[in-house]
Every structure is written in C-alpha cells, then in structure tokens.
Amino acid sequence: MTDFGTANDAVAICKAVMISIAPDARIMDITHGVTPFRIEEGARNLESVSPYYPAGTVFVAVVDPGVGTSRKAIVVKTKKGQYFVLPDNGLITPVIDRDGLDSAREITNQSWMIQAAISSTFHGRDIFSPAGAHLAAGWDFNLVGPVVPQLVRLTLKTSTTTDKGIEGNIIALDDPFGSLVTDIPGDEFKKLGYSLGDKFRIEINKKSVVLPYVKTFMDVPVGDVLLFIDSRDRVSIAVNQANYSKKFGVEPPGTIFISRKGAPIKDK
C-alpha cells in the first residue's frame, strides 16, 4: 500500500525488488491511491484490510512525507502474528490499537536493504520493499535491527455519543464512487432509534442535509442521497449512481452530526 499512484514506475520498481529477493512470494496490492501525504488515510486502509489476511502476512506500507529525515524505518509484529514494514510515523496506530503490539524493530541491518546506495527520497524501493521481501522469504524478524521501545502515534479523532446524538468524522472517500465514509460504527448509529426507511436531518460540516436511512443504494431513486451502513460497519453517505463528494464538494477530513430520533438538530 502506498500513495505513489500508478502513473509512474515506482510501484513496478518496488515489486521488482521484492520478486528478486522472494520469487515465490504472492504480492497483492491494497491500494496505491492513498491521497499523497495523508498518513491517517493510509492507516485507516491498513486497519480495514488487515483482518482479512492470515497470521504471517507481511504488509509493506509507504505513506512517508518524512522520507530521508530522522524518522525510523521499522517492522512491527502484531499479537495477531502479522508483520508491517513501514515508516514510524503513526501509520500503524489503528492496527496496533485493535490487534495489539508484539514487538517493533528498526530496520538497520544493511543486508535487509537494497544492495546499492540508499536514496534519500525512495525508501520504498531501498528499505521497505527489500525488508518486506526478506521477511516473506523466511528471514528471522529478530535480525531486522534493534527493538523500538516507543512508536510514533497518530492522534485519531473518534466519534462521540452523547444524550443528543453522535458527533463523528468524515475519514475517507470510497473512491471512485465518492461516498463519504465516517468513523461512526453501525451499532452506535442504530442506538439512536432510527429504522430503515426513516428520513431525517443530519449535519455534514455544519450544513443540514435531509436523507433516508436505507439498506442499499437502489432503495432510493437514482440521484438521491442516502445514509447506509457500509460493508465495514461504518455509517456512510452516498448518492445513488453519482459521486457525493463531487456533487456537494465535500472531502475528508470533515464532521458529521446525527441527532437521536425525535431530538432537534444540534444548534448551529
């Protein structure tokens, strides 16, 4: 997973490095479309995807605005037995919050890096990809380098439930469809008292929007807005067969407020 995009050769080069070290490894792409430099967006992607992979899986993740600085390159082993090769910039925060931290080590062993001069701007090629490939090839995690006693953490915003309703955050777009993904768990939303088919008013970035709570997109006419619980069990906002983000000019980060059923919308 990276923020490299696919319009240049960076991803192909990283994969070539991996294959040259671990030719039998199965390399799968999570995404290379993380918004450039948005560490939290990348972290949320890792959080969302990693539960579907088995113990022993090696994830290489590069969203690294601090490349070439004093920030550490690390390998994290979770208590679930998965490995994450990435910069120590908080990219791993939501994963270890959920799965627990077994150990973290700084990548200092030169034999785990590309055997050439290390670029100051392409650690994805020179450090993260070869380190991940060595792990996938069965090299001992303990040989990566010294233990990192404390990791850099992201300060993640979380939804808050009160007697008035839920205040949450728009944390991502479901591209290419442009749906707004929030951090409000489906179970928390359901405690507000709404039933499928209910139509009500919410606030997105403090602007009122009237929309129905439905199960899926075709439960409303084409072009209408809707609120639904997505496949990750998060409240999401969409337009049936259109791009909500482009239609209404809303992008993350942002805020959302949903009042309890029967309660007045929050004062402006």
Model-predicted regions and their roles:
Residues 181-249:
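A conserved acidic, glycine/proline-rich C-terminal tail/linker
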Residues 243, 253-264:
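Pepsin/retropepsin-fold aspartyl endopeptidases
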Residues 3, 131, 240:
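A residue-level signal for conserved active-site and pocket-lining positions in enzyme catalytic cores
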Residues 13-17, 45-48, 94, 130-134:
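Alpha-helical scaffold segments in soluble metabolic enzymes
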Residues 1-33:
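N-terminal glycine-rich anion-binding loop in soluble enzyme alpha/beta folds
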Residues 4-8, 66-69, 244-247:
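Short acidic, Gly/Ser-rich segments with clustered Asp/Glu that frequently serve as metal-coordination loops
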